[in-house]
Amino acid sequence: MDLILLVGIAVALLVILATLYFLQNKNKAAGEAKPAAAAPRRGVPQRAQEGVPRRAQIARNQRNRLQQNAPAPAPEAVAPAAAGDSDDDEENVGADGARLPQGAVLNEKMGAKKRAKMEAKEQKRLQREHELQEREKRKVKEAKEDAERKQQEEVEAEAERKKLDAERLAKEERERKEHEEYLKMKAAFNVEEEGFEEGDADDQESLLADFIQYIKDNKVVLLEDLAVAFKLKTQQAIERIQELQANGSLTGVIDDRGKFIYISQEELAAVAKFIKQRGRVSIAELAESSNNLINLTPVQSAAGGDS
């Protein structure tokens, strides 16, 4: 029993000693590794020592991601792409023949694309501004033309209105003067008529005989002249002629031109005889024969011609 206990104690001591020895060796190795890691290694870049990827690696990773995200190129674009790669390789070489970092080349390309995009946007903006300015100019021009046209129309309308007003005033003035003259003539005729009516019967008979003789002598009498000659109104002269025709003292016709044509009884008989002899007579034949059968020459003119 004592032997087994002693063996167990010995085994436990051995295990404890082995564990302590193992831990001591591990701590010693770790202490030696830290100073070695802290010291920089010659010929190795700092970024590599720190485990940071190089710029070329970053650019390559970015290019790979862009190629993965980009759509597949067309077959005819494969050759230009290959040529572009060779151009990129040539562009990666600097002026002194040294190869430029891939990241720097990528940044330059990205700047050119962005610059081209910005230039295109600026060009579109300028184009829009130019179109807007042209549109504004057209609007201003059209508005100016409309204003000028309206002004011209207003001027023409004003001129037309003034013209109509002037014509209206002239017409009113002319009518006023005619009315005044008519009133004056009416007053004069009334005075003359009163003086004529106040005469005695002998004077009236003498004037009536002169009236008839005046018509017979002139053959063709303008009614206005007849009225003025005997100080009558034109309507009064017409009424007096119609009364004389009704009682047989005068024979003749009043035409549409305001004239009385005296035709004697002998001339009427000659015209009636001509129509009776010919039977049916046209108006043209009757007019031609009337010129021969009816004498329209005034008595004074005929007497002057005979002398």
Curated annotation (Swiss-Prot):
Residues 32-162 are annotated as: Disordered. It is a single-pass membrane protein. Its main location: endoplasmic reticulum. GO terms for cellular component: endoplasmic reticulum membrane. Residues 1-2 are lumenal. One of its GO terms (molecular function) is ubiquitin-like protein ligase binding. The chain crosses the membrane at residues 3-23. It is found in: Endoplasmic reticulum membrane. Residues 32-43, 54-83 have a biased composition (Low complexity). Residues 117-162 have a biased composition (Basic and acidic residues). Residues 24-307 are cytoplasmic. Keywords: Endoplasmic reticulum, Membrane, Transmembrane, Transmembrane helix, Ubl conjugation pathway. Belongs to the DDRGK1 family. PANTHER family: DDRGK DOMAIN-CONTAINING PROTEIN 1. Substrate adapter for ufmylation, the covalent attachment of the ubiquitin-like modifier UFM1 to substrate proteins. Required for ufmylation of Atg9; protects the nervous system during aging, possibly by stabilizing Atg9 and supporting its function. Interacts with Atg9; the interaction is transient. This is DDRGK domain-containing protein 1.
